[in-house]
């Protein structure tokens, strides 16, 4: 499905597809949703939400990729989540609770995004039932993915982690650099390269 509102621009196509793939919704309601999102461009490596900041909004990825990461006690980057094209991404605990973040939200490539403020997002949840369904789906997917990763990684060595990723999230190894994928797996890039060459 294509949408050409806002002067004929098609910046809302992917967001429209995301919503209509999850719920039945009228064009009128879609346009209400679209009117609350603003187009934003991010540079490669740009930090969108900093450590110890309060998250004020949500991003939908039209092009590019976002990630949530922090630094471990050894000073190494640890990535918790990647937001790929066609999906939502934010520092969710801070977004919900309005507490300080313990991570960074970064564009890892030049990205075209749609941004919605927290107040507008919650307004849509309260006033557009289909958007509430979408939000519930985001929360459920986030919970399931987090549980898979936590329990999937428990007690795994490096090889088992890579095999787990190949089984459950194969796109990560195809779409990301070794450095980024390794930061998600909690192993070194050289270890990841060595394992990939053997599999």
Give residue spans per PLM region:
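Cyclic nucleotide-binding regulatory module and flanking cytosolic helices
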Residues: 2-38
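Cyclic-nucleotide recognition modules
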Residues: 79-136
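Short beta-strand segments in beta-sandwich/barrel cores
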Residues: 38, 65-70, 112-113
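Short phosphate-coordinating micro-motif centered on Lys-Gly-acidic
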Residues: 48-53
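Glycine- and acidic-residue-biased ligand/ion/polar-headgroup-sensing regions
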Residues: 45, 56, 60-67, 85-86
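Short, Lys/Arg-enriched N-terminal segment that forms or immediately precedes the first helix
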Residues: 142-151
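Phosphate-/nucleic-acid-contacting segments
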Residues: 4, 156-199
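His/acidic/aromatic-lined binding-pocket segments of jelly-roll/cupin-type domains
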Residues: 39-40, 56-61, 80-81, 184
